[in-house]
């Protein structure tokens, strides 16, 4: 079913990838990948995103051959994170720090995420930003933002404003 789409067939049907993720990570290069569901479809987005996350994880883990203090930070930004929130991503979250893989993830609401991924997020994330949220999300996020912000604060936040919890130097 996936190979019926020319875009997907051209990507996954290659013998060798022309994208060297290790070089990108080690040399602080920028890689932008547009996996917009509107362009490639929901299933194709999930397939390619999952494959990419798995490759990024294995590439990050390969960097064990570089002493920790010499590893360069690599920053991964994932918009609409719920589309890629798999068991593999939960593992990436729990091991990212030791491989200097820094993650920034965005999504609309917490219940979009499987419970194991939610647990991995709140167990491993140092910094958190929140715009106005629903009552159910507010109660979950309040646990992360207390004693400074309450569930009521999160629900009544003005448009275009946000609350943050920032982790600096660990």
For the regions a protein language model found, what residue spans apply to each?
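C-terminal regions of RecA-like/P-loop NTPase motor modules
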Residues: 110-170
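P-loop NTPase motor domains
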Residues: 1-101, 105, 117, 154-158, ...
């Amino acid at each position: 079913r996936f190979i019926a789409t020319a875009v997907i067939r051209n990507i996954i049907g290659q013998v060798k990838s022309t994208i060297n993720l290790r070089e990108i990570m080690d040399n602080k290069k920028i890689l932008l990948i547009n996996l917009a569901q509107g362009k490639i479809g929901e299933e194709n987005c999930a397939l390619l995103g999952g494959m990419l996350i798995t490759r990024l994880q294995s590439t990050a883990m390969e960097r064990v051959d570089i002493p920790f203090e010499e590893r360069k930070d690599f920053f991964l930004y994932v918009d609409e994170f719920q589309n890629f929130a798999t068991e593999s991503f939960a593992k990436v979250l729990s091991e990212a720090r030791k491989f200097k893989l820094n993650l920034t993830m965005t999504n609309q609401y917490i219940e979009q995420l499987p419970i194991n991924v939610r647990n991995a997020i709140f167990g491993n994330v140092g910094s958190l930003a929140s715009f106005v949220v629903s009552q159910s999300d507010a109660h979950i996020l309040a646990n992360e933002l207390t004693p400074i912000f309450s569930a009521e604060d999160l629900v009544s936040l003005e448009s275009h404003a946000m609350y943050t919890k920032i982790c600096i130097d660990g």
